[in-house]
């Protein structure tokens, strides 16, 4: 029995990958899950204020993991998982690789976003030399303090929610969701997901992004 459903946002709750337009049918499916007693949590590379707003206005109750795993909110409690990244380091990364900073960087402390989202070997080396982690979600590059990545944040959320791995479902679209999948019992990759994610998923869905969310929730509720 699934008690908690972890859902990624960009590329998963949206109409497709590469758009920020949320799929209304997917939101309705999340509400159906909540009504049936499955709590829904957002697990995303987005910042805390963006996810907290969505969590409350969409009528979710499972809490959230923001900043690509670095920030957790559950039942009124907030928790920082990763080391803080100094502002000068964020600017230096953008300057070195000629990247644009996300408008959400103003609201972040441990994980920062940049575009274009193309991850290069030199960036990984640059981050490693400074004790940092860099990943790409397909929407943005993420530079984070250690441990970085969705896994550590999801472990903390499950602990706060007092939910076991076997009682947890997860759905996502990108490589950055692999770590989230390792912490969940049933995992579903949308049809347009990165091949690396499909390889580790327990279910490869027939439908893309938001339509895939409806498909997965129908499965969980039937
Ligand atoms: O913030 C991003 O780059 C993408 O966010 P996601 O984890 O919801 O796909
Ligand atoms: Mg995504």
Swiss-Prot record:
Gene3D superfamilies: 3.90.1070.10, HAD superfamily/HAD-like
Positions of substrate binding: 150
UniProt-annotated binding residues for Mg(2+): 8, 10, 173, 177
Disulfide feature: none
CDD domains, alphabetized: HAD_Pase
InterPro entries given in the database record: HAD-like_sf, HAD-SF_hydro_IIB, HAD_sf, PGPase
Described purpose of this protein according to its UniProt entry: Catalyzes the dephosphorylation of 2-phosphoglycolate.
Superkingdom per UniProt: Archaea
The keyword Metal-binding belongs to this UniProt entry's keyword annotation: yes
Enzyme Commission number, as recorded: 3.1.3.18
GO molecular function list: magnesium ion binding; phosphoglycolate phosphatase activity
Active site: 8 (nucleophile)
Enzyme class: hydrolase
Similarity field: Belongs to the archaeal SPP-like hydrolase family.
Protein name (database record): Phosphoglycolate phosphatase
Catalytic activity reported: 2-phosphoglycolate + H2O = glycolate + phosphate
Cofactors: Mg(2+)
Coiled-coil spans in chain: none
Record's keyword terms, sorted: Carbohydrate metabolism, Hydrolase, Magnesium, Metal-binding
GO cellular component: cytosol
